[in-house]
């Protein structure tokens, strides 16, 4: 088993130097040009003190700058801690402190007391210093840390190694295949593992990426028709937007795959795609699995509606209940294993031991397998709210609500929304005088916009069982009756 590999981008620039690597709007960059840009960023980062083994926070939007920073950190041998640009300042500061980063590189206005903050422009306008570029990557070494929320609501830093990212890209290629003319349209944020994984595929496959800086359905719709795109990653909301713009038309036959994540797609949506000849591949994955770990081929779009498919070639999946593997059609916890699965969480030994046992990742998600081994996901970590492809954990919102002096109890569940799929709804027991408007405003100051409840309802008491555990299913029933 290999322990090291040549520096990925440097090797790609050597093998196919003049092949187009990245397109952003009208700009085209070849692999050798990308390598040269990254070396320059690497030398500037070296001057500001970034060294091998250190953790550097990256708070940037999709763009050439973010791409070069991520690669430059790997050239130095530093770990990139990728931060969600939609989080509140308070949330970002907590994650940076937890990850023990030595500095933040950003393209946004941001101030932090205890952490040096460098704007990308500031870094690039400063002096250079000769950098010690990593000629080889150790597959066991951490490359990135991406935060994901747990059922406790406290975010956990998922450590993904070079080996994890390599295995993810290989598994995807064995699943979807590779073509010389492939072009993947990247519209997912690169601070999410789904977006980041495309950067890995880009340099490993030597595949052209058409990068969209910000989600723009009109631009994407046009690009699918005119830019030679063969693969695109989407969530249901994006797919719905594209079909609205497509109307009675169709996309070119060269579009061979729409990789759909973020939860099962409604059957009418899939039927429309079948009618229009759009091949939709439904997937199941998470940050801990370096992106997808299961995929449903377009061949089964309608015969296996609601299924997330079967595991990637080098991965395994089973359903457990009370620690025992159960037969088909019996519901239980989804447990997965593979070289793309994280080895654990940063500084969270207890959570790592609880979640990963003998190499098997206990996802906390509920599902079952049918008689042919197709996975059906019933609940994403049971309480998870998926809003426009973003994961929202009720416990984090409840923690914020309970920090208000006029809130005695709080419970949050998902509420169906035509635009986003789901949005948070809060139920509150008051300890003093407070209005719904005041509660929502309080949340706006503490949480990312997409996490702020769209409604706050007041109850005399929250439904609980004998152990005083909150009964979310009863709150969901109240939402349905509203």
Curated annotation (Swiss-Prot):
InterPro entries, sorted: AMP-bd_C, AMP-bd_C_sf, AMP-binding_CS, AMP-dep_synth/lig_dom, ANL_N_sf, ATP-dep_AMP-bd_enzyme, MenE
Instruction: Supply the alphabetized keyword list.
Output: ATP-binding, Ligase, Menaquinone biosynthesis, Nucleotide-binding
Q: Where are the transmembrane segments?
A: none
Q: Which GO terms describe its molecular function?
A: ATP binding; o-succinylbenzoate-CoA ligase activity
Q: What is its EC number?
A: 6.2.1.26
Which BP terms in the Gene Ontology apply to this protein?
A: menaquinone biosynthetic process
Q: Which SUPFAM superfamilies match?
A: Acetyl-CoA synthetase-like
Q: Which reaction does it catalyse?
A: 2-succinylbenzoate + ATP + CoA = 2-succinylbenzoyl-CoA + AMP + diphosphate
Pathway as given in its UniProt record: Quinol/quinone metabolism; 1,4-dihydroxy-2-naphthoate biosynthesis; 1,4-dihydroxy-2-naphthoate from chorismate: step 5/7; Quinol/quinone metabolism; menaquinone biosynthesis
Q: Which domain of life is it from?
A: Bacteria
- HAMAP family in the record: MenE
The UniProt function text for this chain reads:
Converts 2-succinylbenzoate (OSB) to 2-succinylbenzoyl-CoA (OSB-CoA).
Q: In which family does this protein belong, per the annotation?
A: Belongs to the ATP-dependent AMP-binding enzyme family. MenE subfamily.
State the name under which the record lists this protein. Answer: 2-succinylbenzoate--CoA ligase
**Gene expressing this chain:** menE
